[in-house]
Regions:
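Fe(II)/2-oxoglutarate
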Residues: 1-78, 395-414
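Conserved double-stranded beta-helix
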Residues: 2-5, 9, 285-414
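Generic surface-pattern signal
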Residues: 17, 24, 42, 46-49, ...
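Residues that form generic nucleotide/phosphate-binding pockets
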Residues: 18, 22, 36, 99, ...
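Helix N-cap / beta->alpha transition motif
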Residues: 56-64, 89, 199-201, 359
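Non-heme Fe(II) oxygenase catalytic core, chiefly the N-lobe of the double-stranded beta-helix
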Residues: 71, 76-79, 88-322, 341-347, ...
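Beta-strand-loop-alpha-helix segment that lines the small-molecule cofactor/substrate pocket
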Residues: 82
Length: 414
């Protein structure tokens, strides 16, 4: 459901007055939380300096064999992100990369990009947007989404969450509905095409929307230590301000799968691997040095920017993901701050397929019903700019390309 706001400054002033009144001790509470964030940032930077993983690295073979060690699981819950090695065979991923390149070239996508619809979602981020293409229905994307391996990885990630709490069952972790997303094809030498640090999945809604306030109920009550980023209570119930390219599904993790080798310096992903970072962002906006009608620069219908002026302790922990090989995947909690490097200083393309992890729930089922006609017609999905590039593309995936699992994940029903 959409969450409309008629007078944003008035809504912010009213909400902040209520939230501040409910937490008269917000200043010392925030100082304690800021100390926790600083300690986590120090640990992350120490790990990086000493050559240890700043982002937990798992092997898909261990997930498949149910032998991921408890220390890795604990690190994943603390850092809010992970790399999964070998979800796909490297040759398979490289072949998919070649197939997508041929699909793009055969259908003259570059000629059509000049007429693409405006993607306003990233408009306020410092460095424009990376080279992300409105391609959703290529056969490699369909094959990857419906693959048993990536499905098993997504179910594993879903199960890291508390799917039942507050006396309710919030979602079915065993289901992995397909959220159709785009591809990135970033050539070497490209610059000023990154994304500055931000969070997806809601900006001003995190303070203004009632269910989002319930998500952060412990934080807003001053008990941030009781806040569990992996408690799913109320998350599938949140409502977003209507906007192109704002995700309408509840994702347990955002993610992408590498199609080419890439790593630090290759114009790829950076993370602030702090799972409880949003507690800091939420409380920061309620401090007395922030104007009454401002939420640290948050804008409706946009990515939630994390800015040096307001969030410097968090930004200290921004680190690159480790080197990735074709077939590896990276996933990060929806509240984890992420960015994309401005410059690609490497020698090869940094190409990925965006494939997130999402569970079965009413919110996601409702989106599948809206997304399915887009697939059948080859149109851009409802959440994305209405480019509709693929309607007449040769080689586009069709319903016949779906496996039984793929049909279920797309919402075809029995």
């Amino acid at each position: 459901m959409p969450f409309p706001i008629d007078d944003l400054p008035a809504a912010i002033r009213t909400t902040k007055a209520v939230l501040r009144a409910a937490m008269p001790n917000r200043a010392p509470v925030f100082r304690a939380l800021e100390g926790d964030i600083a300690r986590q940032a120090d640990a992350i930077l120490t790990d990086r300096a000493q050559g240890r993983d700043t982002i937990p690295v798992l092997r898909f073979a261990d997930i498949a064999a149910d032998r991921v060690d408890p220390a890795s699981l604990a690190a994943l819950r603390t850092r809010g992100a992970c790399v999964i090695r070998g979800v796909f065979d490297a040759r398979q991923a490289s072949d998919w990369n070649d197939e997508i390149a041929a699909y793009v070239e055969a259908n003259r996508l570059d000629d059509k990009l000049a007429r693409r619809a405006e993607d306003r979602y990233f408009g306020t981020l410092a460095s424009s947007r990376p080279q992300i293409y409105g391609i959703y229905w290529s056969k490699p994307q369909i094959a990857a989404r419906q693959s048993p391996a990536l499905t098993q990885a997504r179910v594993f990630l879903n199960r890291l969450w508390r799917a039942q709490s507050e006396g309710r069952v919030h979602f079915d972790p065993a289901r992995a509905p397909a959220y159709a997303d785009r591809i990135r094809r970033r050539p070497p030498g490209s610059s000023s095409l990154g994304l500055s640090p931000h969070v997806d999945g809601g900006s001003v809604e995190r303070w203004l929307e009632p269910n989002y306030r319930r998500v952060y109920r412990h934080v807003l009550a001053g008990d941030w230590r009781a806040y569990d980023p992996f408690d799913a209570a109320f998350r599938p119930d949140v409502e977003e301000i209507p906007s192109p390219a704002v995700c309408s599904m509840f994702r347990t993790f955002q993610g992408w799968t590498a199609l080419t080798p890439q790593g630090p310096g290759d114009g790829t992903l950076q993370l602030i691997p702090v799972a409880n970072a949003m507690a800091y962002v939420v409380l920061r906006a309620l401090q007395d040095d922030v104007p009454d009608d401002d939420l640290c620069g948050a804008q409706p219908g946009r990515a939630l920017s994390v800015l040096p002026a307001w969030h410097a302790p968090l930004l200290a922990a921004l680190v690159p993901i480790p080197p990735m090989e074709p077939g590896d995947a990276v996933f990060w909690h929806g509240d984890v701050v992420h960015a994309v490097e401005d410059a690609h200083r490497g020698t090869g393309y940094s190409n990925v397929m965006y494939i997130a992890s999402a569970p079965g729930c009413a919110k996601n089922d409702a989106y599948l019903k809206r997304q399915l006609p887009s697939f059948l017609r080859g149109e851009s999905p409802p959440d994305f700019p209405a480019d509709h590039f693929e309607t007449d593309f040769t080689g586009r995936a069709r319903a016949d390309d779906l496996s039984a699992l793929g049909r279920e994940q797309m919402g075809f029903g029995p």
